[in-house]
Amino acid sequence: MALIAAKDLAVGFGSQVVADKIDFEINSGDFVCIVGENGSGKSTLVKTIMSLLPPISGHVVLGEGLKRTEMGYLGQQTDVQRDFPASVEEIVLSGCLNSCGKRPFFNRQDRKLAEANMVRTGVLNLRRRCYRELSGGQQQRVLLARALCASTRVILLDEPVTGLDPVASAEMYRILADLNRSGMTIVMVSHDIAPALEHATKVLDMGKETVMMSVEDYNG
């Protein structure tokens, strides 16, 4: 069974359909790049997979025992979020909230996980810094570390390199590729198609029809 599957899915806001007739399967270990024009429903689809938006019709089915609370998510930042006055370590630790349950504090295991993910994303040396003082690339790596605290299996990312300079973008892609090689399933929305496809294994093209294909088929 697929890790994540859509069956005759329609997504949108309220009764307004943004994209429909969506069928796909994502398997464990895939690196899926979601592409399409502005307004084609890419971000809406990711939010629907995460249950941040309800489907208008159809279903998103999770397999292999995966729960939505076990999926990490890195969404697009607002200006308010970029200016959040917390330390890097506090931001990353907040990714452990799902595992806390009714426990009103972070334990030693949570802190070890946060530290390990700060190492993986190269932000451990920034742990005491205020988040809003960081560069855009540093902030994105902090948010990725937080998302990794929420999941060891699947990460969904919405335009993770938008607004980053070429060096910061390349570093983000390197980290994502390393995560995928270690077994993490990556699902990423991107307008930065060429570099994204260097690492992707599949493309979900949300054109006139939503089609899942190999990178080779997408490149023609």
Features from the language model and the residues they span:
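H-loop (His-switch) and adjacent beta-strand-loop-beta switch element
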Residues: 201-216
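Helix-to-loop junction immediately C-terminal to a conserved catalytic motif
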Residues: 50
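Conserved structural motif at the start of ABC-family nucleotide-binding domains
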Residues: 4, 18-19
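Conserved ABC ATPase "signature" region
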Residues: 108-126
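Catalytic Walker B motif of ABC-type/P-loop ATPase nucleotide-binding domains
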Residues: 155-158
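H-loop/switch region of ABC-family ATPase nucleotide-binding domains
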Residues: 190-191
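Conserved ABC ATPase signature
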Residues: 130-134, 138
